[in-house]
Amino acid sequence: MSTIENFDAHTPMMQQYLKLKAQHPEILLFYRMGDFYELFYDDAKRASQLLDISLTKRGASAGEPIPMAGIPYHAVENYLAKLVNQGESVAICEQIGDPATSKGPVERKVVRIVTPGTISDEALLQERQDNLLAAIWQDSKGFGYATLDISSGRFRLSEPADRETMAAELQRTNPAELLYAEDFAEMSLIEGRRGLRRRPLWEFEIDTARQQLNLQFGTRDLVGFGVENAPRGLCAAGCLLQYAKDTQRTTLPHIRSITMERQQDSIIMDAATRRNLEITQNLAGGAENTLASVLDCTVTPMGSRMLKRWLHMPVRDTRVLLERQQTIGALQDFTAELQPVLRQVGDLERILARLALRTARPRDLARMRHAFQQLPELRAQLENVDSAPVQALREKMGEFAELRDLLERAIIDTPPVLVRDGGVIASGYNEELDEWRALADGATDYLERLEVRERERTGLDTLKVGFNAVHGYYIQISRGQSHLAPINYMRRQTLKNAERYIIPELKEYEDKVLTSKGKALALEKQLYEELFDLLLPHLEALQQSASALAELDVLVNLAERAYTLNYTCPTFIDKPGIRITEGRHPVVEQVLNEPFIANPLNLSPQRRMLIITGPNMGGKSTYMRQTALIALMAYIGSYVPAQKVEIGPIDRIFTRVGAADDLASGRSTFMVEMTETANILHNATEYSLVLMDEIGRGTSTYDGLSLAWACAENLANKIKALTLFATHYFELTQLPEKMEGVANVHLDALEHGDTIAFMHSVQDGAASKSYGLAVAALAGVPKEVIKRARQKLRELESISPNAAATQVDGTQMSLLSVPEETSPAVEALENLDPDSLTPRQALEWIYRLKSLV
């Protein structure tokens, strides 16, 4: 904002603007003036750049021209969407006074603040993604983290113990807006994130947080929510709730509870694992060819969002998982009937949030009515499903016959977008409204009669009666006949080819009609607000219904996917281990144009590490990732792509697969690789599933091999995690001979002339060849380069059978094996004392050593 020294020098309107802007200095202020939202000074300059709109000037105030930009009020949603997507927040200032009775500027106030994390408008949200507001707090004992989805009322908190866990939570939740304390120490953790908001320390005070939360939930303490002993999480939650209330400028009745998310309740995946497994986002940042893209054929947006939450938080409670499995099995015969009906339910969850915020639009209520109309048919279909969990969902979804009847009587079939447009409340719902409408709607008949009468009376055949929003009712006569207008016709408007007049009788009728229209619209708005009052007492039951419908959508979807994609129900076992028969990669098998080669896997305490060798493009990474994805799918309760699966307890999934430079943090590829490896070695347990791909390739051969060997030893002997260890260091294939619990498997290929065929089939034992030059040729490396490489390979192999790491056989020398017998020359040198030699003796020793070499 430009500094204005003399406040009194401004016009009254600009004084009002400056007072409001001073209350919201950090964000854009949309200041309502008639049919436009105006922005002034620095706000105008910023908005013109962000929105690509014209920057103009509005006269002068305090002797200086005022930069100004404006947007039409009817198009505000489009502009808000653009700003929110760029991480901006906007204060919406409306006229609340009556211009007709106002002395000086019309009274205005900020009615809501639109921020990236607190939006609930349908036009601003991505319907199949959660939109989270989050707050982060840190003290000497760790982090506190809270998230709120204001569009559903879902409120969660957690207490990540360390930086890695906090980073994983940030990646999992991906908040649209993140609040942090002004003294937050770990800025490198959040730098570069969208929607960062620095907040004062007092907003994170624990006593204030407890008071805020108890007030919100109507409780005396927080014991019932299981969060009483989570002080760091509560500090974050208190700040977050206060911010939500400040921005919405209303109560938040749909936020009725808070849930503690504990690490031990779900399978932990760090940020690298979520990225590498491409659960909901591929490595390029898109949604194509991800696990969610294959599994998500849900028919409601709220079901899609729930499925993605399941995928990012696999549960460890086998009772929950067995219940989901049983439900999926029971629903498989009913998917074709249930999905078309569920599709009609729509996004009831977000509609209810807008109802709670009293921002629901007429079409929201029409959609709610349509959702209620599906419930009897859904309940009838589910009655035939022999499953206790399904029947529990059926009860939770309710029927709401009274509310359905209310909305059928109150709202017309296809209402307009906004209640201010009128025509929302159905005829017959309110007698007084019908009377005012009859008076207003009778205008058409009256005008037709008046036009016929005046034409006959004046004899003017061009005379017609009309209406426009600016000038009201008028009698129009062509320019050629205007000189014949009767004396009682008073000119109202001159056009190029016509004149428009008013007569006392028409003016009287206009006042009467406009009064009736105004009163009808005012009454309609009042009745619309009263509908909120009738619906809101049922909010808790309605939210339970929406949650049950979303869960039903997810389970019906997983049943359909299991049947369509030939998935099988996995079996949970008590001991650590994974046994897969004919396993397939859920994503790769969908994008291949040829049959996917299924492969087995056997991991157990006695066979806890597989050393995987084979050519590049042979399928090692696919084999590893498919194992992790099958485990992940099993732990959301889904069926899995395999013939048979037995899976034991898993506490964490780690992946060290691929790497790139992290230039923003100044970390090389190798540094990124080692950081991820360190995280695995510090945090993995015997119940963890670990994928290690090409450890050590970012440094010299000897360094890399040494690190890979030591990491493999540590994982197999000390941690005893279930590990898939892919490598091109063929020396590692000797590990099974040196330690218990390690086995070799490989993926083979066949060479024929200059071509290579990858078999993609996993076999026991180590690979016999790396096929690196064949893959290079396949990639299009020039023939002369390949030819030279073959020559160099033969040279290296003649020097050391191990130098090229191409052939593996019984005679291969390990880089890490004991050295051969020391040469005579070296032995002679070791026994020699140079200080005791005479010059002649030294010369003789040189000749003698020469003969020994």
Curated annotation (Swiss-Prot):
GO terms for molecular function: ATP binding; ATP-dependent DNA damage sensor activity; damaged DNA binding; mismatched DNA binding. Keywords: ATP-binding, DNA damage, DNA repair, DNA-binding, Nucleotide-binding. GO terms for cellular component: cytosol. Coiled coil: none annotated. Gene3D superfamilies: 1.10.1420.10, 6.10.140.430, DNA repair protein MutS, domain I, MutS, connector domain, P-loop containing nucleotide triphosphate hydrolases. Pfam families: MutS_I (PF01624), MutS_II (PF05188), MutS_III (PF05192), MutS_IV (PF05190), MutS_V (PF00488). It comes from the Bacteria. GO terms for biological process: mismatch repair. ATP binds at residues 614-621. The keyword Transport does not apply. This protein is involved in the repair of mismatches in DNA. It is possible that it carries out the mismatch recognition step. This protein has a weak ATPase activity. Belongs to the DNA mismatch repair MutS family. HAMAP family: MutS. This is DNA mismatch repair protein MutS. It comes from Escherichia coli O6:H1 (strain CFT073 / ATCC 700928 / UPEC).
